[in-house]
């Protein structure tokens, strides 16, 4: 929220120094307060073991579907931080104002997480994730309103960003649980690492793609890319839910047979 203010008043280089300070604080807190989870410290991690885990994960259809949803939705947020400043600037917002307006996305994400935590046991993880995907699709469509001259204000776009953050909050935590629960216990750690890497990779690719096709100067181009990927995200979430139900049915049949 304060990156725009810092950059506008103290220079953009100061933002990197600020990130370094906060990164050092987070690292120190994790080092001091996060307990070690490895019980057998003599066990060594080898490249071969990691490769075998990844080969197993790429064969798990449910994991791939939910990992796809997580990667796409996380990439949306990362890429928006790259092209949204240009649209807010065209709407007359200063860098400081952009930071404050765009912070509504994070506030929406926090609220989405709270709603998810409260209702996931009632609606189910798959259903709530699918609802969040549809919500994000609608919010991306509403971003088009910022292109209509009569209502093209920073508030219009920031409201759509808030809705997008809310949908993101409904999705990411749930699909993370769904992805990790769809693999065997021994592959959970590798699955978590692979999932994080996929999110970063998709974010970098999507951000570069949008700038490459001119989405930073033509806002509608960026929205078209987000809209198409949002539909793919919905399909992945739906298919992942179907595969999870099939696997649960098979496990139930095996248990009943025994």
Label every PLM stretch briefly.
Residues 1-32:
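Helix-loop-helix hairpin linking two adjacent transmembrane segments in secondary transporters
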Residues 1-10, 88-89, 119-120, 210-218:
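Interfacial helix-cap and linker-helix signal at transmembrane-aqueous boundaries
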Residues 35-67:
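Juxtamembrane intracellular "pre-TM" segments in multi-pass secondary transporters
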